[in-house]
Amino acid sequence: MAESLLELKKKIASIQKTGQITEAMRMVSGVKLNRTEKLDQEYTIYNDKVRATVSHLMSSQIVKQLGKETKEYNEFGGSASIDYSNFFDLGTLASLVQPRKKIKSTGYLVISGDRGLVGSYNSQVIKNMMSIFKDADAQNKDVKILAVGSVAAQFFKKQNLNVVYEYSGVSDVPTYNEVRDIIQTAVKLYLNGVYDELFVCYTHHVNTLTSAFRVESMLPISDIDINHKDTMPKDYIIEPDIDSVLKTVLPQFSKSMIFGAILDAKTAEHASSMTAMQSASKNADDVVSGLKTKLNRARQAQITTEITEIIGGANALE
């Protein structure tokens, strides 16, 4: 019985130490979450403003050339059907906004983590992507993968998938300069025709307890809202000309969208890590509580046995 009590005490001490570690990790993840969540919210506001400005700038030029109520403009039916070459001379950068006539290859920029202990964060990304790749294979589509995060990169390579680029080691609070190589490579491969469209696949942070897997079309840029019903209260002074401005703004806009996805995914990763460590700490407390109950019962049984033996010995002496 004494050996059993000793084993229980060792188990309790071991699990308590594990619980202390997971609680410390929960607190660290919470601090990281607060930082990236604030940055993510601020960057979303910035990105929305950039999108609105680019959309308004391009709309105003198209409206100016066609006239707000012309038949040609009304027949566009949205930005996807517009031939931008009729309005802008963007050269090779035209493909940033103009869908290619034939899609020969599709690129997927997949964002995962570099480590475990983040709950189902990585497994959900991989599960959803394998479903997408399975559908693409069934349709004989050529797929090229850009993997951000060692977990996804290693898994996809083991599955013999076409990983054309991989990057690991994104910091807990990523900056644009840090991930510049990822962003520039993604855009460069698209402009060079390695793939004809690019989707960014990542986990969107909703709140601490909720996240959602997203597949967003990044290239060609589809978030430009060309709408002839928009009011045009802003007057732009464009120097030197609209084409030069767009040649600078459009690449920056496309890169900012990719960075926004990376920042959002990192926020979701911290939230998942914090939730997982919180759950682990609670489980440790529950196990310790159960073991302490078991220990107390074992002590009571030992004391009862000792008392019985003492009484039995006393009776034998009478």
UniProtKB/Swiss-Prot annotation:
Q: How does it assemble?
A: F-type ATPases have 2 components, CF(1) - the catalytic core - and CF(0) - the membrane proton channel. CF(1) has five subunits: alpha(3), beta(3), gamma(1), delta(1), epsilon(1). CF(0) has three main subunits: a, b and c.
Q: Which GO terms describe its cellular component?
A: plasma membrane; proton-transporting ATP synthase complex
The record's family statement is: Belongs to the ATPase gamma chain family.
Which molecular function term from Gene Ontology is one that the record holds?
ATP binding
State the NCBIfam families in the record: ATPsyn_F1gamma, PRK05621.2-1
- CDD domains the record matches: F1-ATPase_gamma (cd12151)
- Which protein is depicted? ATP synthase gamma chain
Residues annotated as coiled-coil are: none
Give GO terms for biological process. Answer: proton motive force-driven plasma membrane ATP synthesis
Tell where it localizes.
Cell membrane
Q: Gene of origin? A: atpG
Q: Which UniProt keywords apply?
A: ATP synthesis, Cell membrane, CF(1), Hydrogen ion transport, Ion transport, Membrane, Transport
Gene3D superfamilies according to UniProt: 3.40.1380.10, ATP synthase, gamma subunit, helix hairpin domain
- In which broad location class does this protein mainly occur, judging by the first location in its UniProt entry? membrane
User: Per its database record, what is this protein's job?
Assistant: Produces ATP from ADP in the presence of a proton gradient across the membrane. The gamma chain is believed to be important in regulating ATPase activity and the flow of protons through the CF(0) complex.
- Answer yes or no on keyword Cell membrane: yes
